[in-house]
Regions:
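Extended ligand-binding regions for polar small-molecule ligands
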Residues: 59, 68-73, 116, 125, ...
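Extracytoplasmic small-molecule ligand-binding "clamshell" domains
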Residues: 71-155
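N-terminal secretory signal peptides and thylakoid transit peptides that target proteins
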Residues: 32-49
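Short helix-initiation/N-cap motifs at beta->coil->alpha
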Residues: 133-145, 189-190, 206, 224-234, ...
C-alpha cells in the first residue's frame, strides 16, 4: 500500500487528518499495458460507462451465474495454485462490501457488484461454483496484508495497480480502467476541480491511491482519511468534510444511490488513470498468467460485458 513519511492526527470529523508534506511532488503516471483488452477498457472507463455498468452490477450480473468450467486437477500443472484450488473446489476472494456498483453487501450478506462478478468468472474457470466462493470483506488498507498472509487467494476490490503495491503483491489485468474524480453535495458550487481544493477538507480512504495523490499533489488541502468510502460519504453528508475523492466509477455509484444529496464535480472529470487489477501472491507467475488469460477470454466471449 502507498506509504508516506508524514504523520497523522485525529480529527473531529471521525477520520484521520494526514500531515502535510513540506514539498510538492507529482505522482508518476501508471505504466499501463496497452493490449487490445486494456485499450477497450480504457475507452469504457467513464462515468457514463459506470452508470451503465451499475445497472447490471448492482443486480449481481442478472439471474445467470458465470459459466463454470468442467475441469480436472490434472488439467493444471502439478503443484500449481490452479490445481490446488480446483482440487479443493473452493476459493477465498477479498472484495469491498460498501461500494455501490462494484462490491456491496446484498440482503443475504453476500456482496454483489462488478468486482464480485469478475471473481465468479475467475472461480468458474477453475471449476468452482459461485456458492463455493468464500467472500472476505476488504478495505483499502488491508488488501496487501490479506494477500501476503494467505487470508485470501485473490483480491478483486477496485484495486489500482501501481509500482508500490507490486513490490509486495502481483496483479493480473487490468480488467477496468477508472480515473480519480471528486464528489460534493449538490448545492456546492465552490469546488470546480482539483485546482480548487486549497483549504478544503478532502475525504478519502487510508492506503488508497487517491489519498496518496492528494498528499503528493495538493499539500494545501486538508486530507482526512477514513477506513471506507461509505464513511467518507457519511462525513460529507454530515458537513464534516467538503469533498470526497476516489475513482469516478466508485463515486458514480454513490451518486446513483443518493442523487438528491450528491453530485460529481464536472460530471466526473478525471485527473488520473486507475487501472483495476486482481491481486495475488507475489511470484505466482503461473497463476497470474492463468488469470490474465481468463480475463482476456471473458472480454472476448462477452461474459465481461454481462458481469
Amino acid at each position: 500500500m502507498p506509504t508516506t513519511d508524514s504523520s497523522s492526527t485525529a480529527d473531529p470529523a471521525g477520520g484521520t487528518v494526514a500531515a502535510r508534506h513540506d514539498h510538492r511532488t507529482t505522482r508518476p503516471k501508471e505504466n499501463i499495458m496497452r493490449s487490445p483488452l486494456n485499450r477497450r477498457l480504457f475507452l469504457t472507463g467513464t462515468v457514463g460507462a459506470a452508470a451503465a455498468l451499475g445497472l447490471a452490477a448492482c443486480g449481481g450480473g442478472g439471474d445467470d451465474e458465470p459459466e463454470v468450467a468442467d475441469v480436472d486437477t490434472a488439467d493444471f500443472p502439478e503443484g500449481s495454485t490452479m490445481a490446488a484450488l480446483a482440487d479443493a473446489g473452493r476459493i477465498t476472494i477479498g472484495t469491498k462490501f460498501d461500494q455501490p456498483l462494484f462490491g456491496q453487501a446484498g440482503p443475504d450478506g453476500d456482496p454483489v457488484g462488478f468486482d464480485v462478478e469478475i471473481g465468479k468468472i475467475l472461480a468458474g474457470a477453475l471449476g468452482i461454483e459461485a456458492g463455493n466462493i468464500d467472500w472476505v470483506e476488504t478495505v483499502s488498507a488491508n488488501r496487501e496484508p490479506f494477500i501476503e498472509n494467505g487470508q485470501v487467494d485473490l483480491v478483486v476490490a477496485t484495486y489500482t495497480i501501481n509500482d508500490t503495491r507490486k513490490e509486495v503483491v502481483d496483479f493480473a489485468g487490468p480488467y477496468y480502467v477508472a480515473g480519480q474524480a471528486l464528489m460534493v453535495l449538490v448545492d456546492n458550487e465552490d469546488i470546480t476541480g482539483e485546482d480548487s481544493l486549497a483549504g478544503k477538507k478532502v475525504a478519502s480512504v487510508e492506503g488508497s491511491t487517491p489519498a496518496q495523490y492528494i498528499l503528493d499533489n495538493h499539500p494545501d488541502a486538508d486530507l482526512v482519511n477514513f477506513d471506507t468510502y461509505s464513511n467518507c460519504v457519511t462525513a460529507l453528508i454530515n458537513g464534516q468534510v467538503d469533498v470526497v475523492t476516489t475513482d469516478n466509477v466508485i463515486l458514480a455509484g454513490f451518486v446513483e444511490s443518493d442523487p438528491d444529496n450528491l453530485k460529481l464535480v464536472n460530471d466526473g472529470e478525471t485527473f488520473t488513470d486507475e487501472p483495476y487489477g486482481v491481486g495475488l501472491a507475489k511470484g505466482d507467475d503461473d497463476f497470474r498468467t492463468f488469470l490474465n488469460d481468463t480475463l482476456e477470454a471473458a472480454y472476448e466471449d462477452g461474459s465481461w460485458a454481462a458481469a
